[in-house]
């Protein structure tokens, strides 16, 4: 029997359909889902079916952390049914093929499966790799199997071990220092902490920003037949008196001093790699984790190529004309027709070129009827980006004019899209057109209106998910496969609110303490160094053991520094957490409102002045509370979110929520009467 192992059940189903020509049937192997045809069984895993962990003797959080980080780690099954199914199938197998995703994680998952198989039967194991789940790609891969890349898998093992050791040690230290144990623990990690520091640092700059007023002068002008808008050449006036004097000096007419018209070439975008794709999806309002989940589903179903890639250069073997030709019918027919009319299709090229996977591109034609709305939105983004990379540059007509009105210099700029080029296919990149008529030097135009507008300087914007992922990529924080997961984890742990990314008080407290006493943890340099070393495992330059030991030595020094400052760190964290637990001001006595617990263990918003003041508001019995930085405009109380599992729901203002509940009860009683 030929056993084929895939990374997920949906991938197993797809590969079985392709290889069997649709003749495969669903079955169970020791309770695990599988697909059978002829003498072949395709079994899907659930990602990693084993994990690294510390042995039971190190589960106590009172364990000395220096001992913990040097303790041996053990492999623990996480999906016992699938492990049992894999072992059962291995007994009957005379050939095993690993068909997991071709990246570091996929190679490690494949090695994990191979190890389980070999523990049952010493059978031959080969490896297939593909970048698209299309019949052509999958069948080609199975015609030319290779071996598991042990160096690539070992790199994944090293990352697992390093992340476990750093995460466990730092999380235990921070949580015990803050006296936050159980479900209320505070997490930290080698990638998580510097990423959170970026978000906190941006929030700090926003809080420290002091707005300054400035004034701008806007002028409406007209020729004999057309109108246009201009600004004062000074742009921003820092002094109101100067701005007032300037606008009063502008007369009823203005004379054209210079006029220039030029054409600007607007190059098409580069092919999508993971980072650019997530940034583009984020701009459409799709969270990074949601975008990646959707892209993975599209890949597994055969609609797009593998979405985890650093590559921004299409490989020579990709037939661009054939890829466009499949869209000659359907919703993108006109786009395809325009591209196919070109004598030669030449794609743009980005700076990053790798040999594992191509950039993300469509592999099958879909219609809206084939996909649910979210999947279609992502699929359309990928298709349109692909078309844009094969298109001509857009062209803009740029016009610039300077004018003089009684010695005051004015200016205006016009921008018109003269040739749409790639922008026809990719409407997401919006640039506002501004009309400016053709003028000539010495021409006199009429001033029809002038306006002095007061504005103020604005603080830097909070990170969007796409922007942060680009910054993480630039700083070497995480990998293309993990960056969106890091952001998701920060939200789940109560460290950030999303869209845009805004740190909670807990996040600020933890980051501030780490920055003060162990800045190495919050800086990207250490993490980037470890990532570079793990990349060297892939090439065989370094061993997994060397990298793990090197990382552990760094962590040992960090922990020693933290130990020396334990009392100060504990005090800093607890003070910060107390401030974060404040909901608002008590309307009865003006003391702080905090989250309290009753004698029976129930929680509520209560006055810190208890027992003198007994004001209180109810809270949900279950779920993890997150007190956000946003406040109710009516009651000046901080809004609360409740985490249930991996999802959050808005409780809102405790006072508003309670008042609404009281009103509903009154209405229900009246209806009953």
For each of these PLM feature ranges, what is it?
Residues 161, 238-270, 278, 443:
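Metal- or metallocofactor-binding catalytic centers and their adjacent structured scaffolds
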Residues 72-96, 198-199, 280, 381-387, ...:
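Phosphate-interacting basic helix/loop segments used at nucleotide- and nucleic-acid interfaces
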Residues 1-166:
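Intrinsically disordered, low-complexity regulatory segments
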Residues 133-216, 261-262:
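C-terminal or mid-to-C-terminal helical accessory/interaction module adjacent to the motor/catalytic core
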Residues 27-55, 193-238, 387-434, 606-608:
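Structured, non-catalytic alpha/beta "coupling" segments that mediate domain-domain communication
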Residues 273:
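N-terminal cationic and glycine-rich segments that engage phosphates or anionic surfaces
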Residues 2-3, 39, 116, 171, ...:
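Basic, low-complexity terminal or inter-domain segments flanking catalytic cores
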